[in-house]
Amino acid sequence: MRVIFENNPENLAYYDPGFDCKVEWDTPLTDGYNNEYLSNTNLDNEIKNADVLWLHGWGSSVLRNALRIAKRQGVPVLMRGENCDIAMPDGYGLRGWLKRRYINWVLNHCSAFLAIGSENQKYYLHRGVGIHKIFMTPYAIDNKKFISNSNSFELISGDFKSGLGISSEQKIILFVGKLIPRKRPDIIIKALNKIDWKGNTKPALVFVGDGEMREELVKLAPAAIFLGFKNQSELPAIYNIADVLILPSHREPWGLVVNEAMACATAIIVSDEVGCATDLLNDGCGKVFPSGDVSALANSIVYCIKNSETMGKISQITIKKWGFSEDIIGLKKAINYLDLQDVDNT
């Protein structure tokens, strides 16, 4: 396999407008496999010499050009995108008609599809793709790494909590992501304010991430803890002390922070507009509430805080079945479908 990056993934630091801060990832992104940057190679020649072209989405001119080249060269295309109707509906009127024509053009240039989950699979089916062309390749993280790293922090979790000013008996509600309107972090605060804790200790609220809503959130919840942007190596320790992760987003294609939290044995609450809900959430490990419904979120918080320990254990068991091994199975099935069992160049 040879990977061509449209942009240099190893740039030291870049400004992320969603986080509203500079981001520098601490996980190596190009180690251990054959890769090149687009600026250093010829895309036509790369595709011409490939047995199959695997694309991640079609959102840039480079990706769309790659589709055209593959069609011209007769190279089969495997498409793996995030699209789902929950997050990316076609819309109505002329705009919707134009979008459908555009999407149909993209899909007609693809030989098979690698679905990240059930909602993504439905997206393709609703647009006329045959089920025989769709292969499940779950949107996954390195579960083993997150589980191991989380477990390694177990002995110092009490000290970590106290260092944040959180008492040992306090439960922790966690949000991880960009502090932007689409993620709706503010409704967590509104839901907590509706709950009568009946003399019980109120959970601590921790926000990990940054963005345009930070000032507003600080005003709404001055007692909340804002940790700012945290890197991959830092997240397992935070998930480890959290009891419930909440992702209340509007139009969220998936939500990989849910995978991460589940691997670290955390109970989950998501809105019904979060794509992963269909595949990962059940009453055993979490709750799904109607997007924007503050009262429903409040009820979910009460339930999950009460049952967080049991739900966290089920979360970890559930996510172990949604990993890289399943991705490999799906990819092999797709390659067999293309009759390319002896693929050397992808």
Range-by-range predicted roles:
Residues 229-230, 237-242:
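Short alpha-helical donor nucleotide-sugar binding micro-motif in glycosyltransferases
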Residues 250:
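Aromatic "clamp/platform" in nucleotide-sugar-dependent glycosyltransferases that forms part
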Residues 5, 103, 108-158:
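Donor nucleotide-sugar binding/catalytic pocket of nucleotide-sugar-dependent glycosyltransferases
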Residues 309-340:
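A charged, aromatic-enriched C-terminal amphipathic alpha-helix characteristic of glycosyltransferases
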Residues 267-271:
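Short hydrophobic beta-strand element within catalytic cores of glycosyltransferases
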Residues 155, 161, 167-183, 189-193:
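Conserved donor-binding/catalytic core segment of Leloir-type glycosyltransferases
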Residues 76-78, 85-109, 153:
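Nucleotide-sugar donor phosphate/pyrophosphate-binding loop at the beta->alpha transition
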Residues 282-283, 287-294, 302-308:
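Conserved acidic donor-binding segment of nucleotide-sugar-dependent glycosyltransferases
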